[in-house]
Amino acid sequence: MQRSVLHTASQLAHGMCLLFPRTGAFRGLKGPSVSSNVGCKVILALDPPKRCLHAGAALFASKSSAVSSQPADTPRKVPEEREPLTSATEVPKQSPVESDASDPDPLQDKSISLVQRFKKTFKQYGKVMIPVHLVTSTVWFGSFYYAAMKGVNVVPFLELIGLPDSIVDILKNSQSGNALTAYALYKIATPARYTVTLGGTSITVKYLRKNGYMSTPPPVKEYLQDRMEETKDKITEKMEETKDKITEKMEETKDKITEKIQETKDKVSFKKIKD
């Protein structure tokens, strides 16, 4: 009797395990639903009730661990809106025309360096500065060469001003002698040469303006604009001349065609009258 009761209970438990392996058991648990693929395998043996109880415990443990392993929903962070940066191109810039118009005369501008004054003066007064520079450079080099010919020893002076020993040794042991010494002094005196050239250019420009040989030069930008306008005017004149010639040719051709048509009409009307 006891064995039959146990056998019946084992069959009922075995049926319950077969019914609930792939369904969502333990639906009372809070949280997201667990995948339905989790199940249990039932092995038929001599003692099925114990196997079914072990399978049910394993199913419960797997579902509870899956529920606890899932993190809680965290609120999403909304990205903060950044203000657009102002581009560097929005900074107002001074137009080149205004900068050119505000440039002072390089001969009178003392705020820039000597080399910059020399370059700007060359750009603006090149026709006057080149002859002045050639004359002053010839005088400088000739004076140094004459001093070297007269036996002036410049080596102690070069050592005194701190010239490199390599250059001083070349001057001491040089075969050319006077020419090389004069050239070395010529290069050393570059600041003085530039100053004399600028002064000579300024005096020459004032003299030429005073006697009416030279007018005040316009800025480079205005000069280029004038040259472009002259070129534009010449091109416009050429185009107008070409247009006039083409118009004359077209009128001549039109007159000839009109004459031919008129002659043809006269011939046709004459034939009709004759007939």
Curated annotation (Swiss-Prot):
TM annotation in the entry: 128-148
Subcellular location: Membrane; Mitochondrion; Cytoplasm
SUPFAM superfamilies registered for this protein in UniProt: Apolipoprotein
Name of one Pfam family that matches: FAM210A-B_dom
Stretches the record annotates as Disordered: 68-108
Biased composition (Basic and acidic residues): 74-84
InterPro entries attached to this UniProt entry: FAM210A/B-like, FAM210A/B-like_dom
Superkingdom field: Eukaryota
Coiled-coil region list: 221-271
Keyword Cytoplasm applies: yes
Annotated DUF1279 domain residues: 109-221
A GO CC annotation given for this chain: cytoplasm
Keywords of the record: Coiled coil, Cytoplasm, Membrane, Mitochondrion, Transmembrane, Transmembrane helix
UniProt membrane topology term: Single-pass membrane protein
Main location: membrane
Similarity remark: Belongs to the FAM210 family.
Subunit and partners: Interacts with ATAD3A.
Function of the protein: May play a role in the structure and strength of both muscle and bone.
Name by which UniProt lists this protein: Protein FAM210A
Organism taxonomic ancestry: Eukaryota, Metazoa, Chordata, Craniata, Vertebrata
